[in-house]
């Protein structure tokens, strides 16, 4: 039986986005809706306790959507790496979050596993989460080869990417992409995006 908080929502492409194992503990990244706020949260599945909650998405809930929030996670050494995408609805407001360090959307996040265990055991109030890299659109695949981290990312209307993820890397979204903007109903303009990452000093 899953113990999910009352704010958990399946509406607008919400749901459980990834499951994380820390020892015998199972943690879920979920979509939430509460008091006109759409957000993502990490919760402990055995009791529904909240370990982390993002800031609200900037668009009004009636106009928002969780499609593109999808996530993946890996363990490397003493850290958990977790991806969090930028929801695709109303890209004019949501996409810029990938470049904004005040938000966790559009990032590869890094969490010390011992700090996560302390949070699970109620030994600390706040869970420290580091932004490992940013400028991601929909980073739905994450894997490791030896000590290197690779990410598969969905581009807009084509332009999918395979990236080597490095600390403090900036992968350019929404300023550069190999894809094409969607049309106006999603906040786009249907035009191609600047695709040259290197000349624009992005990874």
Labelled PLM ranges:
Residues 1-92, 141-155, 203:
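Acidic, Gly/Ser/Thr-rich repeat motifs that build Ca2+-stabilized beta-propeller blades
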Residues 14-16, 86-203:
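Beta-propeller domain segments
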């Amino acid at each position: 039986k899953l113990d999910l908080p009352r704010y958990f929502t399946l509406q607008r492409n919400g749901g459980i986005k990834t499951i994380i194992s820390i020892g015998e503990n199972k943690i879920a990244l979920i979509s939430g809706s509460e008091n006109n706020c759409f957000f993502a949260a990490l919760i402990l599945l055995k009791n529904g306790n909240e370990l982390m909650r993002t800031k609200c998405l900037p668009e009004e809930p009636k106009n928002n959507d969780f499609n593109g929030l999808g996530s993946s996670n890996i363990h490397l050494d003493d850290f958990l790496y977790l991806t969090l995408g930028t929801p695709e609805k109303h890209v004019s407001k949501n996409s810029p979050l990938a470049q904004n360090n005040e938000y966790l959307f559009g990032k590869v996040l890094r969490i010390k596993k011992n700090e996560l265990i302390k949070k699970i055991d109620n030994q600390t109030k706040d869970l420290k989460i580091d932004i490992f890299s940013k400028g991601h659109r929909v980073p739905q695949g994450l894997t490791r080869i030896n000590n290197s981290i690779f990410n598969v990312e969905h581009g807009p209307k084509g332009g999918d990417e395979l990236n080597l993820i490095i600390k403090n890397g900036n992968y350019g979204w929404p300023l550069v992409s190999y894809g094409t903007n969607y049309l106006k109903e999603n906040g786009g303009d249907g035009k191609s995006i600047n695709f040259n990452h290197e000349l624009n000093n992005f990874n």
